[in-house]
Amino acid sequence: MYMIFSFSAQTADESGQLSMLVSEKVVLLLGKLTSGNLDTAQVGVYADEIHFLVRKMAHFSEYLLLGLTLSLPLYVYRLRGFWLVLAAGLFCAGFAGLDEYHQMFVAGRSPALRDVVIDTAGSITGIYMTRIIGFIGRKTIF
């Protein structure tokens, strides 16, 4: 949760620079994997094209980790099935809403309902991953 809060506390310029750096690294990695020799201008063009996707995948990934790390202990303490999804899902969705509200007070940032939906989808994915891991673990370990 601290990691999410820290990223949300970055100004629009700081956040944009960080996600653009990640976009450039992705383009360079894909260029190496496909044996493409990309010059600096091409890297910039391709990075601009995937920048939005990288930003939204970062939202999804942060909350996927939150969903996993929140639901795993709950699962271990026998909160399972519908109640696990409900409790962890509501907590994560509420935190996503508060996170977007927090961005109202950061320079150049604004809240977006789309981001809350993406965040919630990421956390629900993490929660269901916990359920799958738990189901497989019960069948093989215990």
Region roles according to the model:
Residues M1-E62:
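"…centered on the first transmembrane helix and the immediately adjacent amphipathic helix/loop
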Residues M1-Y2, L84-Q103:
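Small-polar-interrupted transmembrane alpha-helices in polytopic inner-membrane proteins
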Residues Y46, I50, A87-L90, R114-V117:
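Alpha-helical membrane-protein architecture signal
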Residues F52-L66, L113-A121:
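Membrane-interface loop-to-helix entry segments
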Residues E62-V76, A121-G137:
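Membrane-interfacial alpha-helical segments at the cytosolic side of multi-pass membrane proteins
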Residues Y77-L86, R109-L113:
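Membrane-helix interface segments
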Residues A96-T120:
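Interfacial helix-loop-helix junctions of multi-pass membrane proteins
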Residues R138-F142:
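Short, charged juxtamembrane terminal tails flanking transmembrane helices
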